[in-house]
Amino acid sequence: MATGDDIPTFKLVLVGDGGTGKTTFVKRHLTGDPEKKYVATLGVEVHPLIFHTNRGQIRFNVWDTAGQEKFGGLRDGYYIQGQCAIIMFDVTARVTYKNVPNWHRDLARVCENIPIVLCGNFVDVKDRKVKAKTITFHRKKNLQYYDISAKSNYNFEKPSLWLVRKLLGDPNLEFVAMPALAPPEVQMDPTMVAQYEQEIAAAANAELPDDDEDL
């Protein structure tokens, strides 16, 4: 854990296929320092995001690939000293979920046992292809999973809160002020939200498949 301005600071590695909403996820947060840094050697943007908790302020330096993943795998320098990670996929594109194990493998190889959240983005889109019952990778690898929607801010604070609790070893830690987010561009249908949450709860109790048919 690095400290800058006496604020506990963690390197958060954000990975996933191109077009899954990683940059949008970062830019929806208005808590970031506009002085983002660009690491030209790695083709990476580093966005500082500050969260206010009952344990004081916490800063994530979020490493965003700036589209580099479209040209093949990321360099190890992107992952080195990563202390936590978010793997993002698009629930409307099955191939982005099928590639999750590849991103996890690279993270595990370089960063070993860091807390990781898997996020299925674009759950505001009605034509969902990757259903809750088929999302089992996180259970096999002991990751946390959340449905999220970048455009509606649905569940947006949950990945960050879960990671902070893990990093500080405090399951009771809370945000004292909700993260400042850009206004939602779309509204989630409450009926759809209730259905998805019910499906995720049911999937959490279902038996895991023996093989990787879910991928």
From Swiss-Prot:
Cross-referenced InterPro entries: P-loop_NTPase, Ran_GTPase, Small_GTP-bd, Small_GTPase
Region described as Interaction with RANBP1: 210-215
PROSITE patterns: RAN
Switch-I, as annotated region: 36-44
Residues of the Small GTPase Ran-type domain: 6-170
Cofactor annotation remark: Mg(2+) interacts primarily with the phosphate groups of the bound guanine nucleotide.
One GO term (biological process): protein import into nucleus
Residues annotated for GTP binding in this entry: 17-24, 35-41, 67, 121-124, 149-151
Cellular location(s): Nucleus; Nucleus envelope; Cytoplasm, Cytosol; Cytoplasm
One Gene Ontology cellular component annotation held by this UniProt entry: nuclear envelope
Site (Essential for GTP hydrolysis): Q68
Alphabetized UniProt keyword annotations: Cytoplasm, GTP-binding, Magnesium, Metal-binding, Nucleotide-binding, Nucleus, Protein transport, Transport
GO molecular function ontology, one term from the record: GTP binding
Coiled-coil intervals: none
Region ranges (Switch-II): 67-83
Keyword Nucleotide-binding belongs to the record: yes
One Pfam family cited in the UniProt record for this chain: Ras
Superkingdom, natural source: Eukaryota
Main location group: nucleus
Needed co-factor(s): Mg(2+)
Family: Belongs to the small GTPase superfamily. Ran family.
Description of how the protein assembles with itself and partners: Monomer. Interacts with RANGAP1, which promotes RAN-mediated GTP hydrolysis. Interacts with KPNB1. Interaction with KPNB1 inhibits RANGAP1-mediated stimulation of GTPase activity. Interacts with RCC1 which promotes the exchange of RAN-bound GDP by GTP. Interaction with KPNB1 inhibits RCC1-mediated exchange of RAN-bound GDP by GTP. Interacts (GTP-bound form) with TNPO1; the interaction is direct. Interacts with KPNB1 and with TNPO1; both inhibit RAN GTPase activity. Interacts (via C-terminus) with RANBP1, which alleviates the inhibition of RAN GTPase activity.
PANTHER family per record: GTP-BINDING NUCLEAR PROTEIN RAN (PTHR24071:SF0), RAN GTPASE (PTHR24071)
Role of this protein: GTPase involved in nucleocytoplasmic transport, participating both to the import and the export from the nucleus of proteins and RNAs. Switches between a cytoplasmic GDP- and a nuclear GTP-bound state by nucleotide exchange and GTP hydrolysis. Nuclear import receptors such as importin beta bind their substrates only in the absence of GTP-bound RAN and release them upon direct interaction with GTP-bound RAN, while export receptors behave in the opposite way.
Entry protein name: GTP-binding nuclear protein Ran
Organism this protein belongs to: Onchocerca volvulus
Gene: ran-1
